[in-house]
């Protein structure tokens, strides 16, 4: 980190993080946390050191996704120590979430904007991530206080950009447009659009059926001339993996590497990492 960057206010906690990626969506219920989880799992399986920061303060679901609901974070001299996700293959994976700080996982978080902003500032400045290749930030839906706060806190950290998540339906893409416009206003680079829930994979015959429409994400990317990253189907086996890691004490990282979704995400992220994604109008 240069002296100029320190002067501009780069948080000490971020100085050893090579890349920062946000996962955004203007619409709730599109599977954003699922995309965050699978992005982190895929990067970890590729051998990277990965951190995941959950700033969905009123709905912190990632501890459940990673099978870490009963874990706690601890305070050290440099800040909170994130919870490590167990793995016997690939790189390293750590998670920080407000869910670890609640006395009861069922407690509701009823905070006004200033308290949310203060919590996000603390997450950015007071977590001891150590040396990371990637920090993935999971955000709540919309363009609310959390988004404004994270944009302000990252203004000197130069994040690589945002992955925008939508589902195929027009009611979803209409709200996701607002998120794309938000990124443009705060100068977040858009790494691309993912169309999630694009088809349903039958657990019996593995046939993919379009239970919703298809192509909404591609049309959205084309309209804004931003990269289109690909389609992610609904695969019941991913839910089974989450439940299996909890019931059988197996690592989600190790379970995920043999799933069909890992193949899909691996291809998407290879294109992102290699800078080979194309805009929607180029495909």
UniProtKB/Swiss-Prot annotation:
Keywords: 4Fe-4S, ATP-binding, Cytoplasm, Iron, Iron-sulfur, Metal-binding, Nucleotide-binding. Its main location: cytoplasm. ATP binds at residues 26-33. GO terms for molecular function: 4 iron, 4 sulfur cluster binding; ATP binding; ATP-dependent FeS chaperone activity; metal ion binding. GO terms for cellular component: cytosol. The keyword Secreted does not apply. [4Fe-4S] cluster binds at residues 202, 205. Its cofactor is [4Fe-4S] cluster. It is found in: Cytoplasm. The keyword ATP-binding applies. One of its GO terms (biological process) is iron-sulfur cluster assembly. Binds 4 [4Fe-4S] clusters per heterotetramer. Contains two stable clusters in the N-termini of NBP35 and two labile, bridging clusters between subunits of the NBP35-CFD1 heterotetramer. Component of the cytosolic iron-sulfur (Fe/S) protein assembly (CIA) machinery. Required for maturation of extramitochondrial Fe-S proteins. The NBP35-CFD1 heterotetramer forms a Fe-S scaffold complex, mediating the de novo assembly of an Fe-S cluster and its transfer to target apoproteins. Required for biogenesis and export of both ribosomal subunits, which may reflect a role in assembly of the Fe/S clusters in RLI1, a protein which performs rRNA processing and ribosome export. Belongs to the Mrp/NBP35 ATP-binding proteins family. NUBP2/CFD1 subfamily. Heterotetramer of 2 NBP35 and 2 CFD1 chains. This is Cytosolic Fe-S cluster assembly factor CFD1.
């Amino acid at each position: 980190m240069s002296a100029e960057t320190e002067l501009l206010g780069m948080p000490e906690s971020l100085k050893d993080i090579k890349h920062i990626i946000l996962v955004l969506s203007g619409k709730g219920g599109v599977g954003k946390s699922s995309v965050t989880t699978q992005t982190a799992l895929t990067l970890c399986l590729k051998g990277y050191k990965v951190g995941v920061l959950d700033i969905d303060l009123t709905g912190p679901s990632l501890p459940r996704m990673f099978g870490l609901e009963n874990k706690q974070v601890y305070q050290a001299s440099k800040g909170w120590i994130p919870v490590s996700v167990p793995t016997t293959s690939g790189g390293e994976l750590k998670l920080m979430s407000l869910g670890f700080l609640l006395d009861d996982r069922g407690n509701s978080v009823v905070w006004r904007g200033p308290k949310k902003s203060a919590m996000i500032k603390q997450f950015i400045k007071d977590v001891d991530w150590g040396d990371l290749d990637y920090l993935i930030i999971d955000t709540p839906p919309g363009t609310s206080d959390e988004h404004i706060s994270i944009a302000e806190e990252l203004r000197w950290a130069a994040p690589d950009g945002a992955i925008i998540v939508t589902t195929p339906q027009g009611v979803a893409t209409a709200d996701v447009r607002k998120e794309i416009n938000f990124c443009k206003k705060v100068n977040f680079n858009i790494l691309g659009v993912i169309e999630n829930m694009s088809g349903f994979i039958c657990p019996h015959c593995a046939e993919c059926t379009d239970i919703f429409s298809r192509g909404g994400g591609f049309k959205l990317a084309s309209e804004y001339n931003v990269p289109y990253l690909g389609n992610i189907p609904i695969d019941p086996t991913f839910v089974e993996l989450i439940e299996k890691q909890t019931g059988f004490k197996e690592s989600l990282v190790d379970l995920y590497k043999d799933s069909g979704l890992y193949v899909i995400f691996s291809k998407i992220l290879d294109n992102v990492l290699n800078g080979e994604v194309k805009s929607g109008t180029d495909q």
